[in-house]
Curated annotation (Swiss-Prot):
Protein's UniProt name: Iota-conotoxin RXIA
Gene Ontology terms for molecular function: sodium channel regulator activity; toxin activity
Keyword Disulfide bond part of the UniProt annotation: yes
Family: Belongs to the conotoxin I1 superfamily.
């Protein structure tokens, strides 16, 4: 099944709707332009 991001609990299989769980603990939308350092293809379970 899909992984979930603690910030919004949206399934990460729905790429455009899920958030990026950065190593810093900050989560951002996959379409986020402000935090481009966050991966848009890999999601961390936190």
């Amino acid at each position: 099944g899909p992984s979930f991001c603690k910030a919004d609990e949206k399934p990460c299989e729905y790429h455009a709707d899920c958030c990026n769980c950065c190593l810093s603990g900050i989560c951002a939308p996959s379409t986020n332009w402000i935090l481009p350092g966050c991966s848009t293809s890999s999601f961390f379970k936190i």
